[in-house]
A protein has these predicted regions:
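N-terminal cap/lid segment of alpha/beta-hydrolase-fold proteins
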Residues: 1-19
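Active-site loop/oxyanion-hole signature of alpha/beta-hydrolase fold enzymes
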Residues: 15-16, 54-55, 60-102, 106, ...
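Conserved HGGG/HGGXW glycine-rich cap/lid loop of the alpha/beta-hydrolase fold
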Residues: 16-69
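Conserved catalytic-core motifs of eukaryotic protein kinase domains, centered on the activation segment
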Residues: 44-46, 70-76, 136-139, 227
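Flexible "cap/lid" loop of the alpha/beta hydrolase fold
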Residues: 112-116, 122-154
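Conserved alpha/beta-hydrolase catalytic His-Asp/Glu region
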Residues: 137-138, 152-208
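Conserved serine/cysteine hydrolase catalytic core
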Residues: 185-239, 248
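Catalytic active-site module of serine/aspartate enzymes centered on a nucleophile-bearing elbow/loop
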Residues: 235-268
Length: 268
């Protein structure tokens, strides 16, 4: 794949050893940093390298700890704050100071908390159905609503429930979950997502960011209660047709087109 390199980074975050698998492309412009959602991987975003709308645009994507090809020596330490610190460590290792931010679902929440901590580094933010309110925990709240005896049992049942979901691409997503997530990574991440969504004042954090912002969502989720608030506060909305929570699977052409159009408006 032209221009894309794959590397592994040995990092230590909060005393925990990590091996982080990355995919990246260099260039002179400010890079895009992609943070994938739960049950996804960096490969969701590598097709950017084929898209003429991103010609010359560098990017960095990586598998979160406990996901994809990345490993974590203590999965019990995983949480959204831990993923934020991981993102900081990856950026430092890559020598990236300022960047455009794109995050999906879990990655969108991680991206929001990262942008909140370092707003001057974030040139723009595309939030693809990242958590902003309690209603966004339709996946993560299952750790509370569907109690299981152990991590493996919960994960097996979660995969089966997801497979039968009526939302577009859910079965496709479920088919690879066991290959992309370690069961021991689930509880800490899900509990953290629920806590922040319920009590983290995420909407205020998102609306207060100084950078240009887009909120992307699938047409099956066009009933999200806060969409009018986002539009009224100057956030660009991008509804992806024929899609639910996973536009990168259901309608990637439309997703990439909207991302490219948004970035064409940015000066760097």
């Amino acid at each position: 794949m032209t221009g894309v390199t794959y590397e592994r980074l040995d990092l230590r975050v909060d005393g925990v050893g990590l091996e982080i698998a990355t995919a990246q492309r260099g260039g002179q412009l400010a890079p895009l940093l992609f943070l994938h959602g739960f049950g996804s991987t960096k490969e969701d975003y590598v097709d950017l390298s084929y898209d003429p709308g991103f010609r010359g645009r560098p990017f960095l994507a990586y598998d979160a700890p406990g996901c994809g090809e990345s490993s974590c020596e203590d999965l019990s330490e995983l949480s959204i704050p831990f993923l934020v610190e991981t993102a900081k460590a990856v950026l430092q290792e890559a020598g990236i100071e300022r960047f455009h931010l794109v995050g999906h679902s879990m990655g969108g929440l991680t991206a929001l908390m990262l942008a909140r901590q370092d707003p001057d580094r974030v040139l723009s933010f595309i939030d693809i159905e990242g958590n902003l309110a309690p209603e966004d925990c339709f996946l993560s709240r299952q750790v509370i609503s569907h109690v299981a005896d152990d991590a493996e049992s919960f994960f097996d049942a979660f995969v089966e429930r997801t497979r039968r979901s009526p939302f577009l691409s859910s079965a496709l997503y479920a088919a690879s979950l066991r290959h992309k997530v370690r069961p021991g990574a689930v509880r800490g991440i899900f509990e953290s997502m629920v806590e922040l969504s319920d009590n983290g004042d995420l909407m205020t954090k998102f609306l207060s960011l100084p950078c240009p912002r887009m909120f992307m969502y699938g047409e099956q989720n066009a009933s999200l209660s806060y969409l009018p608030t986002l539009a009224a506060r100057g956030v660009e909305l991008a509804e992806i047709p024929h899609s639910g929570h996973f536009p990168m699977y259901s309608n990637p052409v439309a997703m990439w087109t909207r991302i490219a159009e948004f970035h064409a408006q940015q000066a760097r």
